[in-house]
A protein has these predicted regions:
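Charged, compositionally biased N-terminal leader segments and the immediate start
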Residues: 1-7
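Cofactor-binding active-site loop characterized by glycine-rich and histidine/acidic residues
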Residues: 21-25, 29-135
Length: 135
């Protein structure tokens, strides 16, 4: 891995951490209702895995989905809008922390049930193969 690639990955991890730290502050201000499942300490997982995916690949994850969402290209403002219940959020402000969603980026969300993404991911993979699509 080149130095430039290492710096790029570190920058992505730092971006995720920055977002999560902002989430903590906004949550402490009482602007985020419900649960807030943070990704602090797991930044390398999303940065490392998603950086290896192609544009046709799909991502589905569990309830700690902020890092994955940012790595697939969702904007910080869109993600924060979802957390604060605004209509400009990725799930129109109704999904909150566990239910980010961006079909235009092949991001099929986080899921509030532990392990719930496994059968959904299996079905997604089957559909991609069955329909002859890339991914």
């Amino acid at each position: 891995m080149s130095k430039a690639e290492k710096v790029a990955l570190y920058t992505k991890m730092a971006r995720i951490r920055h977002f999560e730290q902002r989430c903590i502050r906004v949550y402490q201000q009482g602007k985020i209702g419900g649960f807030l499942h943070l990704y602090v300490g797991q930044e390398a997982v999303a940065a490392g895995t998603i950086s290896l995916l192609g544009k046709d690949d799909h991502v589905i994850t569990g309830y700690r989905d902020h890092g994955h969402a940012l790595m697939v290209g969702m904007g910080m403002n869109e993600c924060m809008a979802e957390l604060t219940g605004k209509a400009t959020g990725c799930s129109k402000g109704k999904g909150g922390s566990m239910h980010y969603f961006a079909p235009d980026k092949n991001f099929w969300g986080g899921h509030g049930i532990v392990g719930g993404q496994a059968p959904l991911g299996t079905g997604l993979a089957y559909a991609v193969k069955y329909l002859g699509r890339k991914g």
